[in-house]
């Protein structure tokens, strides 16, 4: 093993602009000596690459939306690891064998660049987004590839009376939305929202709070009045990883007091409730707004994803 390999861990889908992985990767290097290069894959791209590399894995750890963690387990590309603070992680937020463990969660809603609305009101509901005054203003990540896009689809589907066995309400909503000529990027579109190119983005609370409080943009976050969903993002140890000991240290770190505080300071709800300080909590919308955000059966959500993607690809684009 070269000296370089000894102090490296490869993470798939650790983009510095997303969820403040930039700060987290620097802290990992400073406190553990392990260098983790940034990586801009989305959840779907990360899983596809791991499956392609199954015979000769390159990554040590992978970060992705929970439904991709469940799929990665089915694909046999991750292995169990029960990290430090295991007992503090709620049952629904981890695989019983530690194949995937939640780090933090986000709530889906509308991230709105108020200055880019051209005088239109801030939309408050899924139905509002169908109004012609928002033509050319709405963006969402590709629901057939990016986890955040699929979460948006699940959220509108639940809000419109659908369930994991029936995505007709979501498909109908996306069909109607096409009249407003939405913009559909494949990867994180944060900068395009800040610049005003995409005035309204279907995205998580933590990105909107970051825009508002860190980048001082005139950004509002809206939890739509018909309801929405909250989902965890999870981390896994890759099966037959080239640097498994370093991979385990990285997982331990992002679940440690220090690692969890970094997520909370980036406006993410840390999986360990004790890590959310009163100072961090005051940046969030009130609990009365979050009452409209539900958790879902993430196994069912994972099971439904392929069929939804196929339906979306055939009927929407």
Label the predicted regions.
Residues 66-73, 194, 199-218:
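A ligand-binding cleft/hinge motif common to bilobed small-molecule-binding domains
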Residues 109-116, 154-159, 231-244, 254, ...:
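A bilobed periplasmic-binding-protein/Venus flytrap-type ligand-binding module shared by bacterial periplasmic
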Residues 1-10, 317:
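Short, low-complexity disordered leader/linker segments with a strong preference
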Residues 6-70:
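Early extracytoplasmic/lumenal segment of secretory-pathway proteins
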Residues 238-296:
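Mature extracytoplasmic/periplasmic domains
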Residues 88-91, 106, 171-176, 182, ...:
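Periplasmic-binding protein-like
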Residues 292-317:
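Conserved C-terminal helix/tail region of periplasmic/extracytoplasmic solute-binding proteins
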Residues 14-22, 58-197:
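Extracytoplasmic ligand-binding site segments that recognize negatively charged/polar headgroups
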């Amino acid at each position: 093993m070269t000296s370089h390999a000894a102090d490296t861990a490869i993470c798939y889908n650790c983009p510095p602009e997303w969820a403040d992985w930039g700060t987290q990767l620097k802290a990992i290097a400073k406190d553990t000596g392990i260098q983790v290069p940034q990586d801009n894959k989305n959840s779907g791209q990360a899983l596809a690459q791991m499956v392609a590399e199954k015979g000769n894995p390159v990554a040590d750890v992978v970060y992705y939306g929970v439904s991709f963690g469940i799929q990665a387990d089915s694909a046999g590309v991750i292995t169990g690891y029960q990290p430090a603070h295991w007992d503090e992680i709620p049952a629904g937020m981890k695989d019983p064998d530690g194949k995937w463990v939640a780090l933090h969660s986000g709530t889906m809603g509308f991230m709105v660049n108020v200055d880019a609305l051209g005088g239109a009101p801030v939309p408050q509901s899924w139905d509002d987004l169908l109004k012609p005054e928002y033509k050319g203003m709405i963006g969402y990540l590709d629901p057939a590839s990016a986890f955040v896009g699929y979460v948006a689809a699940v959220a509108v589907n639940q809000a419109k009376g659908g369930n994991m066995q029936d995505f007709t309400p979501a498909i109908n909503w996306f069909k109607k939305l096409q009249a407003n000529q939405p913009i559909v990027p494949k990867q994180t579109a944060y900068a395009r929202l800040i610049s005003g190119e995409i005035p309204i983005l279907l995205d998580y609370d933590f990105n909107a709070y970051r825009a508002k409080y860190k980048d001082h943009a005139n950004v509002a976050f809206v939890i739509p009045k018909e309801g929405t969903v909250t989902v965890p993002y999870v981390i896994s140890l890759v099966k037959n990883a080239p640097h498994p000991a370093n991979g385990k240290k990285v997982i331990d770190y992002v679940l440690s007091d220090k690692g969890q505080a970094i997520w909370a300071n980036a406006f993410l709800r840390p999986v360990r409730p004790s890590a959310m300080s009163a100072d961090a909590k005051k940046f969030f919308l009130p609990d009365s707004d979050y009452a409209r955000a539900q958790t879902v059966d993430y196994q069912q959500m994972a099971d439904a994803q392929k069929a939804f993607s196929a339906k979306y690809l055939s009927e929407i684009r």
